[in-house]
């Protein structure tokens, strides 16, 4: 019986990893319990609608998980964020979680290279009455950030910055946005456990995109741990999120 149980558990883990769940929990049942007990019953209707729309999109694994969306929404309220930035938007699930958490005069500078994906969620965002908080910019974020850093009046003006974009540029983003977030403000980097691949052996059967970006994620994690300007906390929420509180 023990052997059979172990075999079933191994199969479950293999299936979990194969479908690329937006959770690092090795038990699908436990993750489902979290969703059904804590997340879905309290999920705002606009977020539920956008989550269900996004689930039909072929790139839906790019979206922020529902539990991470809930976490971001509460975090923003706890820190009383008002001026925020998001790098990497996709259909806007995390953007909507942010917009719903901000006061009516709150602002989000949102950047993504694909406006078409953003427009999938835009009708939901508009219906939720929070579109006026969002300044969406289509195109690469680095040129925009460079211009912002050049203007000293932008330094230390952001309460919260969320990065969920091209992992090979995370270090480049950090070099710039650390100047833009205020002392006491927070930066959130998504996917910092990267499908659990950060601890995978060299011969692990990783998907090509997971293997390609793995070293960039490891580089970021090492850099954040050594950066004296921030306090950090890495959490196994979604695909891993690292919160950085600027202290100097």
Curated annotation (Swiss-Prot):
Cofactor(s) this protein requires: a divalent metal cation
Enzyme class: transferase
Protein name, entry field: Caffeoyl-CoA O-methyltransferase 3
EC number, as in UniProt: 2.1.1.104, 2.1.1.-
Catalytic reaction list: (E)-caffeoyl-CoA + S-adenosyl-L-methionine = (E)-feruloyl-CoA + S-adenosyl-L-homocysteine + H(+); (E)-5-hydroxyferuloyl-CoA + S-adenosyl-L-methionine = (E)-sinapoyl-CoA + S-adenosyl-L-homocysteine + H(+)
Keyword line: Cytoplasm, Lignin biosynthesis, Metal-binding, Methyltransferase, S-adenosyl-L-methionine, Transferase
Cofactor binding comment, as recorded: Binds 1 divalent metal cation per subunit.
Family: Belongs to the class I-like SAM-binding methyltransferase superfamily. Cation-dependent O-methyltransferase family. CCoAMT subfamily.
GO molecular-function terms, A-Z: caffeoyl-CoA O-methyltransferase activity; metal ion binding
Pfam families: Methyltransf_3
TM helices/strands, residue ranges: none
PANTHER family cross-referenced by the UniProt entry: CAFFEOYL-COA O-METHYLTRANSFERASE 1, O-METHYLTRANSFERASE-RELATED
Induction remark: Circadian-regulation with peak levels occurring at the end of the light period in flowers.
């Amino acid at each position: 019986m023990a052997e059979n149980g172990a075999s079933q558990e191994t199969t479950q883990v293999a299936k979990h990893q194969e479908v690329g769940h937006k959770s690092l929990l090795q038990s699908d049942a436990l993750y489902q319990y979290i969703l059904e007990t804590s997340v879905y019953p309290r999920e705002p209707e606009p977020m539920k609608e956008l989550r269900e729309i996004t689930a039909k999109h072929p790139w839906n694994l790019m979206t922020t998980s529902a539990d991470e969306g809930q976490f971001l929404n509460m975090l923003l309220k706890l820190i009383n964020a008002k001026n925020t930035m998001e790098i990497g938007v996709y259909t806007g699930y995390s953007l909507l979680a942010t917009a719903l958490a901000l006061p009516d005069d709150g602002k989000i500078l949102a950047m993504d290279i694909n406006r078409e994906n953003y427009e999938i969620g835009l009708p939901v965002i508009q219906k939720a009455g929070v579109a006026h908080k969002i300044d969406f910019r289509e195109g690469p974020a680095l040129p925009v950030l460079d211009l912002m850093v050049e203007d000293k009046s932008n330094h230390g003006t952001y309460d919260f910055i969320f990065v969920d974009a091209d992992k090979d540029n995370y270090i480049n983003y950090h070099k710039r946005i650390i100047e833009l977030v205020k002392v006491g403000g927070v930066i959130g980097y998504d996917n910092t456990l990267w499908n659990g691949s950060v601890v995978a052996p060299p011969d692990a059967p990783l998907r090509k995109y997971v293997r390609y970006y793995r070293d960039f994620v490891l580089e970021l994690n090492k850099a954040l741990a050594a950066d004296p300007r921030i306090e950090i906390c890495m959490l196994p929420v979604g695909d891993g999120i690292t919160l950085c509180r600027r202290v100097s």
